[in-house]
């Protein structure tokens, strides 16, 4: 049985014998049982004198109709052809032809991008001629007066010009620009050979980007646009990254299967910021709603309300201190006392009502950063009381258990809604909520208040990183910690490639991330419950070995009490797991190896800039309990 190529050869021989005929002569026979229907292809421009021919035949093997077209002459100019019939009927099909840059290839297609998948071959019988096979399966109806249309080399859509070194449409131009500027990394679900055309170009972003690059779109052109040499801007250290976008893909089931990356171009005054204004992430997110939401800066503000807790506090207090030229170390308690107790001393620090309201609003937002149940709220109010009435620094014997059911609940509310397109603010705000929740948890322990004001603040300053890391492990699934850490790792790789971070800095931060990831994974693997997390936090909180502490013996007794209660709980709850207590306690030394400064840079620098967490802790601990709980968003029962 004859193949398609043999049929093509036979037809070309017939064509060459009939090429001298007038271009108006047409013979037509019925299209059936492999017979040939011959249609003349007339050039629409007078510059082409020799008529071209097209024949439609039926493949004997498949029954598919095949168009066999003789190619252009070797002039290389773009030409437009139309089909005509000898009966004088109006033509209804258009073919666009252009010479390819490579020798011996001619592209023939239609303005609607049909026929972009083409097969070229030549025969010895037709020197310097080439033919092309197109499947005759799509409608080619077009306006006869339509001018030659240049097509996108990537998807075959109508091209709008040359972009980044290749002729593309606006869609592929924008896709390529976004992908390169944000340094996005995509994943192909298939075999990395997906069909990219006008209708399916959005199905696989990986293959689309690879096709853009392979067809000549230059990444360097986009980089030059992204980073103008002549423009130098100084960005605010506070909330610098709150308007940038983070891309989160929600098409994968597992939160652990993530491909993420960050890009950064600016540096802060304390080394190089690991979370700056141009840092972007592509995270594959699971367990969230299906609809796609784009959070622009305005929408971020609208949906999050006053949830920029740390940023608002830092900004307001900094403005207040700056306006009165007062050192922060000398005013931190007086400012908080004025807010908490309603004293008139606030007006002495800031004479204008604007400064007054700024600080008040800042602390109003702190209440919205926590998620406590109603029972937890009532219990905290009963056992803690007013934050302004911290007990004096005396050795008080604590009767009853150190922790009760009120201290077990640790429910973190994430910023809502969970959109598909996020910004860096979302990660920093989530970490901010976790930090405030951890501080509030410590304050809810009566024994903690018995240590006195300075001792309690010193303890939290010394161990906030340990409490925060334990909170990360406890809220690992809620916060999607795995994807965030993966994003940090890819960001470091990018920074090394662009020489934005020193190798020593990258090694230090990478080591920190791996330690934090290993700790979270180990806790998740051991299925640590809420009681165990609470006792581990209490043991870390009441550590007497931190420098600068007073009444160390009392702190040591509290730690021993926490250990004894922890031992009793594990023995009763997990009687068959003999070594469970030992394994959990052995995880605590790993927390001491985590660098608090790096944790600040990773999770908070994008929100509060160069302000250190240590300087914010006293303000948080001095807040009224009612300030924490009166305006909580999304209480859970």
Swiss-Prot record:
Keywords: Activator, DNA-binding, Metal-binding, Nucleus, Receptor, Repressor, Transcription, Transcription regulation, Zinc, Zinc-finger. One of its GO terms (molecular function) is DNA binding. InterPro entries: NHR-like_dom_sf, NR2C1/2-like_DBD, NR2C1/2-like_LBD, Nucl_hrmn_rcpt_lig-bd, Nuclear_hormone_rcpt_NR2, Nuclear_hrmn_rcpt, Znf_hrmn_rcpt, Znf_NHR/GATA. One of its GO terms (cellular component) is nucleus. It is found in: Nucleus. SMART domains: HOLI, ZnF_C4. A zinc finger (NR C4-type) spans 152-172, 188-207. Residues 383-624 form the NR LBD domain. Orphan nuclear receptor. Binds the IR7 element in the promoter of its own gene in an autoregulatory negative feedback mechanism. Primarily repressor of a broad range of genes. Binds to hormone response elements (HREs) consisting of two 5'-AGGTCA-3' half site direct repeat consensus sequences. This is Nuclear receptor subfamily 2 group C member 1-B. The lineage of its organism: Eukaryota, Metazoa, Chordata, Craniata, Vertebrata.
């Amino acid at each position: 049985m004859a193949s398609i190529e043999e049929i093509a050869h036979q037809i070309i021989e017939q064509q060459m014998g009939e090429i001298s005929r007038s271009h108006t002569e047409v013979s037509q026979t019925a299209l059936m049982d492999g017979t040939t229907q011959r249609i003349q292809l007339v050039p629409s421009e007078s510059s082409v004198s020799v008529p071209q021919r097209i024949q439609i035949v039926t493949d004997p093997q498949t029954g598919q109709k095949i168009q066999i077209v003789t190619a252009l002459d070797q002039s290389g100019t773009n030409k437009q052809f139309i089909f005509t019939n000898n009966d004088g009927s109006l033509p209804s099909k258009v073919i666009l032809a252009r010479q390819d840059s490579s020798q011996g290839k001619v592209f023939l297609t239609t303005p609607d991008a049909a026929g972009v998948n083409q097969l070229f071959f030549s025969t010895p019988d037709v020197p310097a001629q080439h033919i092309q096979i197109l499947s005759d399966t799509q409608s080619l109806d077009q306006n006869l007066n339509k001018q030659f249309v240049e097509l996108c080399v990537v998807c075959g859509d109508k091209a709008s010009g040359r972009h980044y070194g290749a002729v593309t449409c606006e869609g592929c131009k924008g896709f390529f620009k976004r992908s390169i500027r944000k340094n996005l990394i995509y994943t192909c679900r298939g075999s990395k050979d997906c069909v990219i055309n006008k209708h399916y170009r959005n199905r696989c972003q990986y293959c689309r980007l690879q096709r853009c690059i392979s067809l000549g779109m230059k990444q360097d052109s986009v980089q030059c646009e992204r980073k103008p040499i002549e423009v130098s801007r100084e960005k605010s250290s506070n909330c610098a990254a709150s308007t940038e976008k983070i891309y989160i893909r929600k098409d994968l089931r597992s939160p652990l299967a993530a491909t993420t990356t960050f890009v950064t171009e600016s540096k802060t005054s304390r080394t190089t910021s690991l979370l700056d204004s141009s840092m972007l992430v592509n995270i594959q997110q699971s367990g969230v709603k299906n609809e796609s939401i784009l959070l622009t800066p305005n929408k971020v503000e609208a949906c999050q309300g006053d949830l920029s807790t740390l940023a608002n506090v830092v900004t307001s207090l900094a403005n207040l201190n700056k306006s009165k030229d007062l050192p922060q170390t000398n005013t931190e308690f007086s400012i908080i006392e004025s807010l908490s107790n309603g004293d008139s001393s606030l007006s002495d620090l800031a004479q204008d009502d604007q400064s007054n309201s700024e600080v008040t609003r800042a602390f109003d937002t702190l209440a919205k950063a926590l998620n406590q149940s109603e029972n937890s709220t009532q219990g905290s109010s009963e056992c803690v009381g007013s934050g302004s009435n911290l007990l004096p620094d005396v050795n008080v014997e604590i009767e009853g258990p150190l922790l009760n059911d009120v201290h077990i609940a640790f429910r973190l509310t994430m910023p809502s809604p969970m959109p598909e397109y996020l910004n860096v603010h979302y990660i920093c705000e989530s970490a901010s909520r976790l930090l405030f929740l951890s501080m509030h948890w410590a304050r809810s322990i009566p024994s903690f208040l018995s240590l006195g004001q300075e001792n309690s603040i010193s303890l939290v300053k010394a161990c906030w990183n340990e409490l925060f890391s334990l909170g990360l492990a406890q809220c690992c699934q809620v916060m999607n910690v795995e994807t965030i850490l993966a994003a940090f790792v890819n960001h470091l790789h990018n920074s090394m490639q662009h020489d934005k971070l020193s190798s020593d800095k990258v090694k230090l931060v990478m080591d920190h991330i791996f330690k934090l990831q290993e700790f979270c994974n180990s806790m998740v693997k051991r299925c640590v419950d809420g009681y165990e997390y609470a006792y581990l936090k209490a043991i870390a909180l009441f550590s007497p070995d931190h420098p600068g502490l007073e009444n160390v013996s009392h702190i040591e007794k509290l730690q021993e009490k926490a250990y004894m209660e922890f031992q009793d709980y594990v023995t009763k709850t997990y009687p068959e797991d003999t070594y469970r207590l030992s394994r959990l306690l052995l995880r605590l030394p790993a927390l001491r190896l985590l660098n608090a400064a790096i944790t600040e840079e990773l999770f908070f620098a994008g929100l509060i800039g160069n302000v250190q967490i240590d300087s914010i802790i006293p303000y948080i601990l001095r807040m009224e309990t009612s300030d924490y709980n009166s305006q909580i968003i999304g209480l859970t029962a």
